């Protein structure tokens, strides 16, 4: 086996006259490794923060021995208020990361945060959003990502040296002596997956990205087995990952089993082998084995990866970026989702994130509506509360931590209306919403839309049974708005009106109406109500948006995109709570006349007229400086009848993108032009 040495010369990123000031928050073992290599960076340690001033002072004294003079030792808040600090390295226990990251960003500091960025994806989303809103770097400290060995590995994959990549094997596991300390404590998010499992996961993702050219790779399938020890954490686990395009990976981690801790990349023409790529000792190597060449070894001696990750963070700060190219925010979010799935596959959920947990805001502060938020508001007679014009759909949030993060963001941006249904998630999502409302103590500040009586249980008896069960799940005694999820024309409409009116008079419902009801049936219900002294239907929730619907996604749905329905809504002034106002992605850019891969999209929306609407939405979007999706939402908001469109963002980033439509005020002429009525 021949050996060759790679060129590992690095260029300093800053001068002594412009030397970024670093603070360490959480001066433990890994912080000392960071400190030991910081002299090789362009920065200098100026402060150490800890919950224990004694620990902070000990760390400052150690820094002085490395040549860092005048290092202050103080509390976290005092360190973040220090004007000498440009960037912070967060290295507390996993559960301490989030609040310190948020506090640092609010203080105007760049952040290098030890892995994992957060214990779960919901919390990680909030941190990513905070960095993007602040315009400051947030970098997850997977140290190996910043080492020349990793860059060389990805170049070898990208250049096709081993042909097409087929499989990746990566492991990081070690055996500790006793089941004590943070690694075995569920309250500090202990266990292998969160401590070191992110290393093989992020390595596999980086290799897939290099092999396929995508910016972020996330497994489409994940299966896993593992062992939960007596303290409740994962002590040993193996996961099998499959990526889009067919590349597979086997990843292993643990805190009570020693593994080889290596990476192997297999391709159609050979393989690449890395021994212990995580701790990055004095001379890490890559072995290159190909079918038509002698094996060779690349050597990467004399590097300081902790210094490199520090410089990458401050380089991003100077450039006005919110991330480092070596480990982007979107990669960190994909990693958090993957680790969530891995833990779920082996049945590991920490007590602080359980469905029954009192999960606080990520900052730990009380939830409040932010000043200068973009929300518009309206009224629906009988509700007794002001309603945000956007309605958060509660039909997709995978766990309480995720739901809490995205619901908190919605409220901070002025939102207060939530739409859920008896059938969503088998009832789990109603309970999830109710628990979040209970945790925040805001039942009288929010409007909850409850739906029930979906086919095949669309009858008065089932309506009552489901309503009572929905209220119990939500932990409340009333629904602000109740809507029948479907209609059943085989049952006289008066029977539905009678039972709904009964529940309203009993105080269980404040306002009621129908989802997926025809205008004719709606009118019939109200004619019966007037004739019999009952409360009328007051709200309708049908599909409505800029794109005209030629069919509906599911059986029993009704749309209101045709001219007759629009005229009826304008005449009656019935508040409409439209679902799928974005036409299931028609305005996102993925719909083109040539692309017929999505049969449902084609069936429901493809026509020359709708593609002309899309063209006009883009043209108007260019004028307003917003995407076509924002124009599509603005079209719904600017109708001559009251509208409260539902949206179901899967992430905080999607929620913010959707809300850009709130800033667009269309004239009646622009609304007509978009709808081809000019």
Role assignments for model-derived ranges:
Residues 87, 93-94, 98-145:
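Beta-strand-loop-alpha-helix segment that lines the small-molecule cofactor/substrate pocket
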Residues 356-446, 505:
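N-terminal binding-site loop/beta-alpha segment at the start of enzyme catalytic domains
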Residues 2-3, 202-280, 313-316, 340, ...:
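Contiguous beta-strand/loop segments that form the cofactor/metal-binding neighborhood of enzyme cores
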Residues 1-15, 87-89, 315-376:
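C-terminal helix-rich "cap/oligomerization" subdomain common to oxidoreductases
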Residues 1-66:
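N-terminal Rossmann-like dinucleotide-binding module
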Residues 239, 487, 491-678:
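Beta/alpha (TIM)-barrel catalytic core signal, keyed to glycine-rich beta->alpha loops juxtaposed to Asp/Glu
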Residues 19, 267-337, 351:
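C-terminal glycine/acidic-rich active-site capping loop/insertion
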Residues 146-222, 229:
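Predominantly a Rossmann-like dinucleotide-binding segment in NAD(P)-dependent oxidoreductases
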């Amino acid at each position: 086996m021949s050996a060759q040495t790679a060129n590992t010369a690095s260029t300093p990123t800053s001068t002594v006259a412009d030397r970024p000031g670093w603070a360490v928050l959480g001066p433990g073992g890994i912080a000392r490794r960071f400190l030991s290599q910081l002299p090789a960076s362009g920065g200098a340690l100026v402060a150490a923060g800890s919950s224990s001033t004694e620990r902070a002072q000990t760390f400052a004294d150690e820094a002085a021995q490395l040549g860092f003079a005048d290092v202050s030792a103080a509390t976290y808040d005092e360190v973040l208020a220090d004007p000498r600090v440009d960037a912070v390295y967060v290295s507390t226990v996993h559960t301490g990361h989030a609040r310190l990251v948020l506090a640092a960003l609010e203080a105007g500091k760049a952040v290098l945060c030890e892995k994992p960025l957060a214990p779960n994806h919901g919390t990680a989303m909030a941190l990513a959003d905070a960095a993007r809103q602040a315009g400051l770097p947030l970098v997850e400290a997977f140290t190996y990502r910043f080492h020349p060995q990793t860059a060389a590995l990805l170049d070898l994959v990208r250049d096709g040296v081993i042909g097409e990549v087929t499989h990746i094997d990566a492991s990081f596991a070690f055996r500790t002596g006793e089941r004590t300390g943070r690694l075995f404590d569920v309250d500090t998010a202990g266990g292998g997956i969160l401590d070191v499992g992110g290393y093989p996961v992020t390595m596999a993702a980086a290799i897939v990205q290099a092999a396929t050219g995508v910016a972020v790779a996330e497994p489409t399938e994940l299966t896993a087995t593992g062992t939960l020890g007596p303290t409740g954490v994962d002590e040993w686990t193996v996961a099998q990952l499959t990526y889009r395009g067919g590349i597979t990976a086997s990843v292993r981690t643990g805190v009570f089993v020693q593994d080889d801790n290596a990476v192997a990349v297999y391709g159609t023409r050979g393989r690449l082998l890395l021994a212990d790529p995580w701790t990055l000792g004095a001379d890490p190597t890559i072995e290159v084995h190909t079918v038509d060449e002698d094996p060779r070894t690349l050597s990467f001696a004399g590097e300081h990866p902790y210094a490199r990750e520090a410089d990458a963070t401050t380089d991003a700060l100077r450039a006005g970026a919110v991330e480092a190219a070596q480990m982007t925010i979107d990669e960190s979010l994909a990693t958090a989702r993957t680790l969530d799935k891995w833990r779920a596959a082996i049945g590991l959920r920490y007590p602080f994130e359980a469905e029954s947990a009192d999960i606080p805001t990520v900052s730990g502060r009380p939830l409040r509506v932010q000043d200068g938020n973009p929300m518009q508001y309206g009224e629906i007679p009988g509700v007794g509360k002001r309603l945000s014009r956007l309605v958060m759909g509660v039909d997709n949030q995978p766990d309480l931590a995720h739901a809490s993060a995205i619901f908190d963001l919605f409220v901070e941006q002025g939102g207060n209306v939530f739409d859920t249904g008896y059938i969503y998630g088998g009832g789990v999502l109603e309970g999830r919403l109710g628990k979040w409302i209970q945790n925040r103590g805001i039942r009288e500040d929010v409007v909850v839309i409850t739906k029930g009586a979906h086919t095949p249980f669309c009858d008065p008896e089932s309506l009552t049974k489901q309503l009572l069960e929905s209220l119990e799940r939500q932990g409340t005694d009333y629904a602000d708005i109740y809507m029948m999820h479907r209609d059943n024309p085989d049952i006289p409409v008066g029977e539905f009106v009678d039972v709904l009116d009964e529940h309203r008079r009993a105080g269980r419902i404040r306002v009621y109406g129908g989802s997926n009801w025809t205008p004719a049936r709606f009118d019939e219900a109200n004619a019966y109500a007037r004739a019999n002294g009952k409360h009328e239907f007051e709200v309708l929730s049908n599909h409505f948006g800029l794109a005209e619907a030629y069919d509906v996604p599911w059986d029993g749905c009704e749309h209101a995109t045709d001219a007759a329905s629009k005229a009826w809504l304008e005449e009656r002034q019935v508040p409409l709570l439209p679902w799928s106002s974005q036409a299931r992605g028609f305005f996102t850019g993925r719909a083109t006349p040539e692309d017929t891969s999505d049969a449902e999209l084609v069936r429901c929306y493809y026509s020359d007229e709708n593609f002309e609407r899309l063209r006009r939405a883009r043209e108007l979007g260019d004028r307003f400086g917003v995407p076509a999706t924002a124009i599509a939402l603005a079209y719904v908001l600017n109708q001559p009848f009251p509208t409260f469109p539902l949206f179901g963002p899967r992430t905080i980033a999607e929620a913010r993108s959707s809300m850009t439509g709130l800033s667009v005020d269309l004239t009646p002429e622009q609304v007509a032009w978009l709808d081809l009525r000019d």
